[in-house]
Amino acid sequence: MLVFKASALLFVLLSLRKEAEGWRQYEESIVEPGEVQDNRHEFFLEIAPKLSMSIERAYKSIAIVDFNPDTGGWEERVENQLRPCGETHVIANTTTPLGQSFFQNGDDFEELVQQHGLHSRVPSINGDYPGKTLVVMMDTEIVVRVRNSQLLNSLTARIHGLDNRWYEDGEAYVQQCPVAVRSEHVYRWTANRQGTMIFRAAFPSFGPINSFAALVVVKRRNERLAVGGGASLPIHAEYMMAIQDWPFVPANQQRAGHEMDGLGKWGLGLDRDQAACTLGAQIYGQRDPRVHAPAALVLNGKGWHNQTDVLLRPSVLPLATYRIRAGNNTLFRIAHIGFDSGVRIHIEDHELMLAVADGTHTIPRRIDAIYAFPGERYNFFITGKQNPQKRVYRIVVQTVEKFPTPDDRWLPIFGLANLEYEEEVAQNEAILDEVDWNQRKCAQATSSCVIANCPRPLEGRSECLSAGDLGFPDDHDLKDILKQKVYDEDEFEEHFISINQKTKVDGYSYKSPSNIPFYSNHTRTCADDPCNKRAVAEGRAECRCFHLKQFGLGKVIQLVLFNMGPEREGEAAREIPFHLRNTHFFLVKWAGPEYAADGQTIRSFNRDIRCNNPEEGCFGGGWADSSWSRGNVGGMSDSPPLRDTVVVPYGGYIVIRFRATTAGWFMAESTRSSERQSGVAFAFRVGSNDQVTRPPPDFPTDCGTFEAPPLSLEQREAVFRTVNM
């Protein structure tokens, strides 16, 4: 990984071609931050369209590339129109399945973006997709000049995980105007959180294919791994692993085809083979035709579109490969940058030591696997085996949902990466394609597994750690907001919020305001429009409006988010990955529904929340036990984790707390693209407009809806005279 050097000259010296890293046989370890000048890091990021599986030739001509798993060769299509249509020539071959030396001529591939192995236009960052990892020091200023070189799309940018000024959080028409094509916008963020963050540039911000780059904030150089009890371990290698579920067609088209046009049967594309009609997904045993299989799971920009190849011959595929040494500690920074599916991650025959979630420490725990949902970030490390039994182990990622296969089975979509030992280890090539897909250890009667961040109980003997079980071991000065007590009304606010796939947020589907509210005398909100919420719950109506909530500046804010509501045939119950932008919160309670004796079937919604008639939407919920009001919540965690993204379990609820210290306009949203697009979001203002920090004088504000005022009599007469001259 190449780290940008902080320099004022960076803005004018970076060239797109020199900065692109392209395809690499081995993933590069994250290196130390670049030089810090005047306590800031500066970056230039150009967002431009790029065709995956292509390479650039002389004079900016593009050559189309394909990988052939039958031969293990990279082939270039012959562009001469006088030659046969399917003619290709081989430009690189593999050597052996273990030493995948794909590129004899590395210059040919210095800009190759692989993704799912097919040809798609992606919004690259300085020629790479995902963009290169940015590494900065804690408590420094991050100056990012974003240039929008896309052909058609505007964009905004934000850092998912930092808590900064409200007008630099990138929500179009709430916090800033979109950056127009061929325009630039300079963002200034403060690295006030340690850990793994996500730089995201897109418009709308919940688009299924955004521009992404990881941002790593470190406290000190040569950091060590905290393992509890004041002990620490050296880090010998440190890798980024960005995970994407890649769609066949853009997720917004899938959603529109099902909900608006009734074309869900062809959710994988109208022009695909007739045998490719979708049957939807199986989610926790329920069928849902609205959820479509991703084309691939892509790890660090490398995946493969054909699941048969992934399952039967992974050794010949061009996968992300991470190198490790026996006995060494290797840190993985996981970021789910995908659009819809939650995933489960495990590494063959290796335990994971979970250390960080969403940029904050967790209580160190040894786990066997972890679930990650869109927007979540986790750090875990593994210790290399002293005597590895094979040279290559597999990192296995699979979707939470299951999808139909040609032989009438239901299986997850799988993605793979290689964990390769640098030592010379004898490898039986006959078992190169054998993969421990479902972690045999977890199915054995003599052992059990520990799985972190489970959205619901698991089958078998596995121990499930919910998001609320991860803890926060660091000392902090916010313990006063974590007490189980009745708080005074002038220091505490409690908000009950219904968040559900079917009824969205409190029955409202979010719509952007017509102008940036800070500059508007009156912004029309959901409170200005009548809404038949019973019709919403029954699926007969939609209340789409600017949903705004008000939080008091300086107060302790408690949000009780409950995922309960009507059940409809053909719509599976799903957890909601919830993100509170620009704000870290304490997850003081995570509570699921009540399950039947099998531990899988939901018997009833959690009875802590008052919801007498779920079919009418559970709006206006409250505590069933009124003594829990104003902060006196029963069953609170003794050591609640500090998060910015967490799943709200179906049939259950979460309780989060934070102190509202920064006045401004902010967003809360589902990070699942289909839900965000359909309106699972709300805006909130902390403080009054008089308390909100005003953006700089030249901050762009001329966007949104403009309605010309009526013409005066004199103006109409002037127009009439001009027309009749």
Residue ranges and their predicted role:
Residues L2, L10-E27:
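N-terminal signal peptide
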Residues W23-F381, Q386-P388, F403-D475, H495, ...:
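Histidine-centered copper-binding motifs that mark active-site loops
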Residues G131-K132, P318-T321, L331-R333, G342, ...:
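Generic recognition of flexible, low-complexity loop/linker segments
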Residues A157-R158, M197-G207, L559, I576-F585, ...:
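Histidine-centered catalytic micro-motifs
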Residues T196-P204, P388-K402, T661-S674:
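Short, surface-exposed ligand- or partner-binding patches at beta-edge/loop junctions that are enriched
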Residues E348-T362, A573-G631, S673-Q677, F684-Q691:
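Active/binding-pocket-proximal capping segment
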Residues D528-P530, E538-L587, V647:
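C-terminal substrate/ligand-recognition segments
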Residues A624-R676, F684:
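C-terminal structured "cap/appendage" subdomains that terminate the fold
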